[in-house]
């Protein structure tokens, strides 16, 4: 089995067969992801394997964003202009209930960080923002270096460095 992460393709990927156990995330993939992608609101990246390329193992949704300076931790304010910093937002991250515990969330997150680093080469991206659904999700992101914003405990960001 070889894993692949690609953009959602409504003609190829079976969105209706996906269930992560969280209705809001399932509904987004089933009902809004395709439209958001067509309208330029967000892109949805899906994890599949070559043995069943239509079956979605996990997904994440990305969009452009900004983060106000007042939401950054003090240590992250160095050498920044006096206006919001450019960001990439990962609005959703979900793994199929049948596939949880296999490291697919970590794989998708790594994909997003690599995309942010790549985008940074062509336009400004200072941080990757996530809005965790609950404290357990926030803990997942904190394990990978995300920091809570000063305004909300479930809103986190990861500084994207050029290194």
Q: Where are the regions a protein language model picked out?
A:
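Short amphipathic alpha-helix that is part of the acyltransferase structural core
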Residues: 1-35, 39, 55
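Conserved acyl-donor/pantetheine-binding loop and adjacent beta-alpha core of acyl/acetyltransferases
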Residues: 59-92
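Conserved beta-hairpin
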Residues: 40-64, 71
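Conserved active-site alpha-helix within GNAT-family acetyltransferase domains
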Residues: 117, 123, 131-151
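A short, internal acetyl-CoA/4′-phosphopantetheine-binding micro-motif in the GNAT/acyltransferase core
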Residues: 91-101
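Extended hydrophobic secondary-structure segments that form protein cores and membrane-embedded regions
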Residues: 45-49, 60, 90, 127-132
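Conserved acetyl-CoA-binding loop-helix of GNAT-fold acetyltransferases
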Residues: 101-115, 143
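Short glycine/proline-centered loop/turn elements that form peptide/ligand docking sites
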Residues: 109, 134-137, 153-160
